[in-house]
Amino acid sequence: MKLIGITGMPGSGKSAITKLAEKYKIIVVSMGDVVRYETSKQGLRLNPENVGNTAVKLREIHGKEAIAVPCLNYVNEKYKCEDFVIIEGIRSIYEVNYLKKHAELDVIAIHSSPKTRFERLSGRNREDDSNDWNTFVERDERELNFSIGSVISLADYMVVNEGNYMDFMNDLENTFKKVINVI
């Protein structure tokens, strides 16, 4: 099985990969879902502060690859017969190293400017998003403290998401085809 890791700052367009996954019938496992699940398990409301604090605490308690371990266990238990599995939302170079140590992994980074991402997040209707600039900046700083910048800069592939949606999806699909050797 080959893992396809998706990384990018919040609002960059990572979730667009699910549309391609449906088209190519590839499973998507979201690392963010693991953190949101752990936040809910603690009885906390899903908002940027609680979800962010949960991610920090999980890494403090279980190490810097704390989110990758349960994700990979889940993938190995449920999807070991699949050719490809997408892991969406890789945040840490430690997670990348852990996954590469235990599986074949290619990482696709999706990049958008802070202004573009803020506009997208402000229009999204997810509880852990913010439409306040200061909260947005705090979230970015927290993400960067997880070493997401290293993951993005060391990714195997990069897709920029600043233009229109169709151009982005075409670029993403072309990159995706390279990763799964369809081209």
Curated annotation (Swiss-Prot):
The keyword Nucleotide-binding applies. ATP binds at residues 8-15. GO terms for molecular function: ATP binding. Disulfide bonds: none annotated. Pfam families: AAA_17. InterPro entries: NTP_hydrolase-rel, P-loop_NTPase. Keywords: ATP-binding, Nucleotide-binding. Belongs to the UPF0200 family. HAMAP family: UPF0200. This is UPF0200 protein MmarC6_1392. It comes from Methanococcus maripaludis (strain C6 / ATCC BAA-1332).
